[in-house]
Amino acid sequence: MRILRSEKPLKKRDEIEADESLVLVYQDEVHFQIQTTVTSGWYKKGSAPTVKSFPGRFKTSYSGFVIPESGVLFTAKPEMFNYSTTIDSIRSFINKHPVPDRKKYALVMDNAPWHKKTIRLVEQEALPEYEDIRNSVVFVKLPPYSPDLNPIEQVWRITRRENTHNVFFSSLSLLEETVDSAFGAWAVPNDQLRSLCTFK
């Protein structure tokens, strides 16, 4: 299995898109905190407004995969982020969205430590337990500190802006329902993410 190294990421992206044996996929993880995030508001001059916020530091976590070709978003909900949950999330993705015949997913990932370990184990160990991933995925490593090259970051930004900013959540389950609903709308082919994630 090849590991494509993104020394010139935009050129590499164009090469991947032109390669008929590859289907481009962007992956990333995200936390949504239950604390109220205030981004704007109106209040009288001289007043001292208060903002309701849940008294705790709870969060819900997601591992996301977006296919620019279709705009489809797939999310898994790991309890934590490590190499084991990354492998589980990749498997969940390729089980839900089997790779087309005679193709592989070009899976773009950042340099999180658990991503590095996932790539090392799947590539170097070559154990039978990882064969399904090796048969379906080519890893593409983003340059360090380049979230602007991973458009799934914009998916997280839009989700926060349209669903969680300036909203009080009285329980973690309400936050999860809100985020799950937002992601569910993108679980089928759609123009919004197709446009957002193609760098056109």
Regions found by a protein language model. Name each.
Residues M1-K200:
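Short functional hotspots at interaction and active-site rims
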